[in-house]
UniProtKB/Swiss-Prot annotation:
Stated name of the protein: Fluoride-specific ion channel FluC
Highest rank taxon of the organism: Bacteria
Species name: Chlorobium chlorochromatii (strain CaD3)
Localization annotation: Cell inner membrane
GO process terms (BP): cellular detoxification of fluoride
An MF annotation (GO) of this entry: metal ion binding
Amino acid sequence: MVDKAAHILLVGVGGFLGSVARYLVALWMAPITAVFPFATLTVNLLGSFLIGFISELALSTSLISPSTRIFLVTGFCGGFTTFSSYMIEHSALLRDGEHLYAALYLFGSLIGGFIALYLGIISARWMAG
């Protein structure tokens, strides 16, 4: 029971930090997000990379403990990335008739997310030797 309580706390603290980091990225990128949701795309692609990188390191090395993985992947990356923001921003682009931007956002998020995840895995394998 102690491990579960500790893991819940790790997820909560990681989620808090990830959410704050996402908000800071949104503030930082606000000047360039008037037409296209660059901030959400950025955090989702970076989060995909981090999830791939951290998960691969946790699986193939002893550099990341199970508790650290829970904190970083489930907590931080879970709070940092945001599917709900992606969905509302995508529907707003469609509603506003910005079909080209909507298509770029859709494919950039999906394909870019898979590429970022794979690059994270490759980077972790390279780092692990």
